[in-house]
């Protein structure tokens, strides 16, 4: 390792894999030799190895090739696909799935038993509750006027048991209410009430049918 990392895993596949700084890896993890663990973020690039904070990875996690930046925390039984990225100061709860090419930017807070499918993008500051499903290539945003005006981060909040379909787009600063269902390809420009369906471009809302008014089947 690089620095003062701590590992108690029996199944760590290290090879030449760099583990940066004070990273802490839990028990019974599988970590691929091409993963970057505790990679220094911009403010740490010039620090010595022992000064890099490192990241935390919970017990029984499966980490395939990708990057977990320093100061990120992944809960127990995290599973990833390939080429994922979790940036600094982001916290992810227990039992989450991060699919191939998923990007979770800095300062995000993700709950327990979430499932983010291939290519999903989660921008800076996003707050996600428990049992949230985000489909392939869904895109959350946090800046209404990118590079045209001074950057104003407007994070999105996604409450418990929300499902977001593939290729959906959520505009900055919105709240997606508990149990809401966002249809594939929808462009959401307004807050979505709890237990409502949003579909279309721009999305329009209707109440969910009774058979969909129940928690997501994640973490079972």
Task: Give residue spans per PLM region.
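Extended basic-aromatic, gly/pro-enriched interface segments that bind polyanionic ligands
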Residues: 42
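Extracellular beta-strand/beta-solenoid scaffold signature
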Residues: 15-17, 45-48
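Conserved beta-strand-loop-alpha-helix hinge in the C-terminal portion
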Residues: 194-218
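Acidic/polar hotspots within intrinsically disordered regions
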Residues: 1-4
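Left-handed beta-helix
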Residues: 15, 20-21, 27, 32-33, ...
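Short, solvent-exposed loop/turn segments at secondary-structure boundaries
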Residues: 49, 152-153, 210
């Amino acid at each position: 390792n690089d620095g003062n990392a701590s590992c108690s895993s029996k199944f760590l596949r290290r090879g030449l894999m760099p583990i940066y700084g004070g990273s802490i890896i839990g028990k019974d993890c599988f970590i691929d030799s091409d993963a970057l663990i505790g990679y220094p973020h911009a403010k740490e690039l010039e620090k010595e190895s022992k000064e890099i904070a490192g990241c935390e990875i919970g017990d029984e996690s499966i980490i395939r090739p990708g990057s977990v930046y320093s100061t990120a925390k992944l809960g127990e039984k995290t599973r990833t696909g390939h080429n994922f990225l979790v940036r600094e100061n982001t916290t992810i709860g227990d039992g989450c799935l991060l699919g191939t090419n998923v990007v979770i930017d800095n300062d995000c807070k993700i709950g327990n038993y979430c499932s983010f499918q291939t290519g999903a993008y989660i921008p800076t500051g996003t707050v996600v509750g428990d049992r949230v499903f985000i489909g392939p290539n869904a895109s959350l945003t946090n800046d209404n006027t990118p590079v045209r005006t001074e950057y104003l981060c407007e994070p999105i909040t996604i409450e418990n048991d929300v499902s977001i379909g593939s290729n959906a787009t959520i505009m900055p600063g919105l709240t997606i209410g508990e149990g809401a269902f966002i249809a594939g390809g929808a462009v959401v420009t307004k807050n979505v009430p709890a237990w409502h369906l949003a579909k279309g471009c721009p999305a329009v809302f209707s109440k969910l049918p009774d058979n969909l008014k129940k928690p997501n089947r994640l973490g079972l």
